[in-house]
Amino acid sequence: MAPKAEKKPKVEKRVPGKEGETSKKKAKKSNETYKIYIFKVLKQIDPNMGISSKSMSIINSIINDIFEKLAGESAKLARYNKKPTITSREIQTAVRLVFPGELAKHAVSEGTKAVTRFTVY
């Protein structure tokens, strides 16, 4: 008869909350908003005007929704053209697809102006 294999001792499983164990805190998710930028634009339009926190929250949500739509459409365009990078061209095309008529034209011209201003400095 062959000798029996040795039994290994059971390994204790670590259970959270045991003594001597340091618990890792869950990392905070950064919650970035556009509130300061919305406020700056508001002050450019009318320095005496104010905005309620509820209105600020609504405008911030609108901007986040638009950003998600444009990012998603840009990603689809990049995938469709088999490109690994989203360039200004994909973003410009996404703006034309997402925004209606005249709004798209103005958005494209303002975006082009901003990119030109950014690349000059």
Swiss-Prot record:
Residues 1-28 are annotated as: Disordered. Keywords: Acetylation, Chromosome, DNA-binding, Nucleosome core, Nucleus. It is found in: Nucleus; Chromosome. CDD domains: HFD_H2B. InterPro entries: Histone-fold, Histone_H2A/H2B/H3, Histone_H2B. GO terms for molecular function: DNA binding; protein heterodimerization activity; structural constituent of chromatin. The modification N6-acetyllysine is found at K7, K13. Can be acetylated to form H2BK6ac and H2BK33ac. Its main location: nucleus. Expressed preferentially in meristematic tissues. Disulfide bonds: none annotated. GO terms for cellular component: nucleosome; nucleus. Belongs to the histone H2B family. Core component of nucleosome. Nucleosomes wrap and compact DNA into chromatin, limiting DNA accessibility to the cellular machineries which require DNA as a template. Histones thereby play a central role in transcription regulation, DNA repair, DNA replication and chromosomal stability. DNA accessibility is regulated via a complex set of post-translational modifications of histones, also called histone code, and nucleosome remodeling. The nucleosome is a histone octamer containing two molecules each of H2A, H2B, H3 and H4 assembled in one H3-H4 heterotetramer and two H2A-H2B heterodimers. The octamer wraps approximately 147 bp of DNA. Phosphorylation of H2B was not detected. This is Histone H2B.6. It comes from Triticum aestivum (Wheat). The lineage of its organism: Eukaryota, Viridiplantae, Streptophyta, Embryophyta, Tracheophyta. The gene is TH123.
